[in-house]
Each structure stands twice: as C-alpha cells, then as structure tokens.
Amino acid sequence: MSNMTPKEIKHELDRHIIGQDNAKRAVAIALRNRWRRMQLDKEMRQEVTPKNILMIGPTGVGKTEIARRLAKLANAPFIKVEATKFTEVGYVGKEVESIVRDLVDVAIKLTREEEMAKVAHKAEDLAEDRILDILIPPAKTGNDWETVKTEDSATRQSFRKKLREGKLDDKEVEIDLPAPQIGVEIMAPPGMEEMTNQLQGMFQSMSGKDKTKKRKMKIKEALKVLIESEAAKLVNEEDIKEKALFSAENNGIIFIDEIDKICKRGDSAGPDVSREGVQRDLLPLIEGSTVSTKHGMVKTDHMLFIASGAFQVAKPSDLIPELQGRLPIRVELEALTEEDLAKILTEPKASLSEQYKALLATEGITLQFSKDGIDKIAKSAWHVNETTENIGARRLHTLMERILDELSYEASERKGESITIDENYVANTLDDLLENEDLSRYIL
C-alpha cells in the first residue's frame, strides 16, 4: 500500500493531468486516509469507514484519467468498472457483486507478484542450479547418484560465471516443466460467473498438477521459465489468499464510471432494470455487506468507492437519496479552457506532442511544434468544442490526427527531414474544415 503524502500524490497526478486541483486533492486525501486508518489500533480501525467520493464534470476533463493514474499510485487492489454494464439481480446481465469478485482476483494477482518478488533472488539461484545440473550431470557412484553440490568445484564455478555473463545464452538444453493445464473455456451466462469459475477449477484439477513435460529451449529462455517455476514453489498459496483478502477488504478501491447513466429520468416509464435497480443493488455494497467469492467471504465495509459521471442530462439529485448519502464528498471538475488545452499538448509526461515526435522519429523524421502552432491547435479544439459537442481533451486526438495525416502517410519516403508544425501549417490543414460548421461537425 502506498504511503505517499497527499502533496506527493497530487504532485504525481500533476505530471499527467492538467488542472482539476479539487479532484486531485480529494483523491489524494482519500488515498492517504487509507494509510492513516491502517496505523490505528484494531478497535478504532473497525470504526473508521472511508468517505466515498462523487466526481462530477463534463466528458474529457480528466475523471477517468485520474482513476487510471490513481490505480498505479495506490499500490493497492484497484478496479474500474462502468455502471452501465450491470443490471439488477434476476435480469440478464452482470450483477454488481461481480465487482467485488473481480477486485479479489486483482488482489490475489497483486499479492502473488509481491510474494514472488521477495523470493526472486532465491529462485534465481535455484534456477541456476537446475541449469548447471543439466550442463554438468551429477557423478554416479555405485548404485546411487551423488549430486556434486560442492560450490568450490572449479568446473561448476566456471560454468556459473559463464552463465551469469550470458556466454551460454544460445546453448540449447532440455528441461522438465509442469505440463500445461487443460484449458476448459466455459462461456458464463450473465449472473452465473461464480458457478462457471467453480466448474473451470474442477476441470483443471482433474487434469493433474504433478505431470511434467520435457521441453527444449535456449538457456536464456529456460532461465526465465525456471525462475518463475521455482518462485511459484517457494510461495505459499494459502498465505497469498489470506493476505489478498485482507488487502481487498481494507485497502481495496472501486472506481465506478458513468454513474450518471444509471439515473432514472423523470419522463421514462416501465421497469428500469439497468438504472434504478442497479442503484439499489449498489447500496449494500457501498454501505458494507459480505460477498461470497471463490476465495472466501469478503466484507465491503472498508472499501473506498469513487463514482464519476458527466451529469449532462441527469443531475446528481436524480440518484436515489440513499445512494447520494453514501457518496458524501462531492467534487466538481471544470470544463477545459483554451489555455488548459494548450498545456495538455505539451506539459504532461508523454504528452500528445511528445508521442507524435517519438512515433515519427522511428521513420527518421524530426518533428517540432512551435508555440504558435500549439496555441492554434488548442484554439481550434476549443472552437470546435464550443460550436459542436464538447468532448474535452479528446478533441485534441481528432485534430492531431487530421493535422499529421499526410505526414504520417508519407513518412517512410521523407526520411531525414525536419518539420515544424507552426500556425501556418495548422491553418492550412484545418481552416477549411473549421469555417464549414457542417463539415467540422462530422469530421472534427
């Protein structure tokens, strides 16, 4: 779990997301509170519940990007889901409890990676020993095999040195590996994912875990495979499961996107199985309930829920009152200005302009963006957003593709050229489309 301070978390988010300081502060505090809670004594820890967040803002301003970056920073079980994929219990579609099951699977994977990293050095030594045993077969005396384990053996040490220096990488060896388990892929009927998981587990256990298969491969590849195999033997699956369930219950973060799409609209009639019904099913999950998973029972009392939505048609007050009460922290994200769009093109790490420079550099083209060129692209994006649908920063992707369309097509024939995208270059490619509103509506 991350022990970064709120300022450090916000600073890290600033490297990738322009503006939206209120939203960054809210998620930074929420993430730090996860760490603070774990420092409390057991009795107090049970009483402190997370304050869930509702992020409100137009499309393309950074709601989903904050979630993506938070997942990398959290170093905790994190899952992002779309609210529109779920239906209420009893109807065709995924039920909301599958969110918790997916979170537990993420926690198991994360914990296994952490545990395998702890035994990596030991696994490397064991893998080297297995390779050396193949290269220098054990000596045979009488009826028994005696393994030559003496580390001061000159031959063995010589081969170990060559192995570590990579001089034996291309030599082929034959190694014993666990036989691949029979993959029985069962298409899960909606709402029955848990049962199909159990069936898959049953078929895999019938295939037998102790079977081995000989494979020929180069030493470089064999070492990687053997390190994984040895690390898997060194870790305890029961410990992994126990730690993962604790981590999911106490550090788990669930990000629910597009929550505005499950609001009941006043003019709609008939059963709303994918709207209000889903909200009612989410209530016990957010409030705290126990969900049955194939790894055991999981409590959701201390999981952090972050919901987000554009709320262009619906309003936050259209959510059922009980759900509003369970999302106490409201954060409003602002629409992007012309200056924000210009910053998005240049300031974030791996910004759009840097991505296109790197892509065209592979063809031997040196691409540069002048300041007036960047300003012109930002102004054009803002203008199209204002006159048609406002899709925020996503508009920049459309414009950049349009501006660099010809250059990308002819790049392989223009090797060695140096090209600057300035105001005139942008005007030549975009102005005709911008002036014709009907064309810009469909093309930009």
UniProtKB/Swiss-Prot annotation:
Q: Which residues bind ATP?
A: 18, 60-65, 257, 322, 394
Please verify whether the record's keywords include Chaperone: yes
What keywords are annotated for this sequence in UniProt? ATP-binding, Chaperone, Cytoplasm, Nucleotide-binding, Stress response
The record's subcellular locations are: Cytoplasm
Gene Ontology CC annotations of this record = HslUV protease complex
Signal sequence interval, chain numbering: none
Q: Name one GO biological process term.
A: proteolysis involved in protein catabolic process
Q: What is its main location?
A: cytoplasm
An example Pfam family from this entry, by short name, is AAA
Question: What Gene Ontology terms describe what this protein does at the molecular function level?
Answer: ATP binding; ATP hydrolysis activity; peptidase activity; proteasome-activating activity
- List, alphabetically, the CDD domains matched: RecA-like_HslU
Among Gene3D superfamilies, the record links this protein to: 1.10.8.60, DNA helicase RuvA subunit, C-terminal domain (1.10.8.10), P-loop containing nucleotide triphosphate hydrolases (3.40.50.300)
Q: Which InterPro entries match?
A: AAA+_ATPase, ATP-dep_Clp_protease_ClpX, ATPase_AAA_core, Clp_ATPase_C, HslU, P-loop_NTPase
Q: What does this protein do?
A: ATPase subunit of a proteasome-like degradation complex; this subunit has chaperone activity. The binding of ATP and its subsequent hydrolysis by HslU are essential for unfolding of protein substrates subsequently hydrolyzed by HslV. HslU recognizes the N-terminal part of its protein substrates and unfolds these before they are guided to HslV for hydrolysis.
Q: What protein family is recorded?
A: Belongs to the ClpX chaperone family. HslU subfamily.
State the oligomer form and interacting partners. A double ring-shaped homohexamer of HslV is capped on each side by a ring-shaped HslU homohexamer. The assembly of the HslU/HslV complex is dependent on binding of ATP.
Query: Which PANTHER family does the entry mention?
Result: ATP-DEPENDENT CLP PROTEASE ATP-BINDING SUBUNIT CLPX-LIKE, MITOCHONDRIAL-RELATED (PTHR48102), ATP-DEPENDENT PROTEASE ATPASE SUBUNIT HSLU (PTHR48102:SF3)
**This chain belongs to which protein, by name?**
ATP-dependent protease ATPase subunit HslU
Its gene? Answer: hslU
